[in-house]
Amino acid sequence: MKRVLLLLLCALPAAAGPLEEAGLIDVQTVENLPVFVSLRYATQNNFTGKKIYSSAKCYLHKDAVEGLKKAVSLAAQENEPFTFCLWDCYRPQDEHRKLWQAKPDPSYVAMPKRGSRHSRGMAVDLTPCDFNGNPLKMPTDFDSFTKEAHMDFYDLPADVLARRETLKKIMTTAGFTYTRTEWWHFDKKGWKSKPLLNVPIP
């Protein structure tokens, strides 16, 4: 009897964690979503020079995931098809405060008292890449904090400018809005209705 009970317990699905209860999903567990995850803040390869995240998993709210699915589908239909490499996804509030301490400039990092849209699971930082995960040429690297990263900067090589505009078109069609100072940052519409979270990334 004990053995049967143990087998039944093992067959039950794992209990949802606090992120899942808030509607967030581990992007790499989503079927038919061929994206690459390379969280910069899970490494030292970011503007702080320090590892900010203890986990390299990309969590997004299910609404943002649906938008990302649409963006991936649209990118695959381009004359030169591509997919995306995700640089940042859900960001706990504690980790966001660390970024603010390193760059206390609201033009680039949201003020902690207002909270980041990343902390709602409704923002994603990404770049176009080929289907082997190699990033395509874009105006700047991630978190460059320069005028060249601005969406209204046009003194760029023709192919780079065209790719940035294609990215903007795809993401806005998929239900995201863009940020003027960061070509890589997109917010899913409806983010205001989602709570700020400070749950560690598992």
List PLM regions with ranges.
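Basic side chains
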Residues: K2-R3, R91
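Sec-dependent N-terminal signal peptides
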Residues: R3-P13
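Residues at or immediately preceding the N-termini of alpha-helices
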Residues: P13-A14, Q93
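Extracytoplasmic cell-surface/polysaccharide-interacting catalytic and binding patches
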Residues: A16-W87, Q101-P202
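Secreted/periplasmic proteins that engage bacterial cell-wall peptidoglycan
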Residues: L86-R97
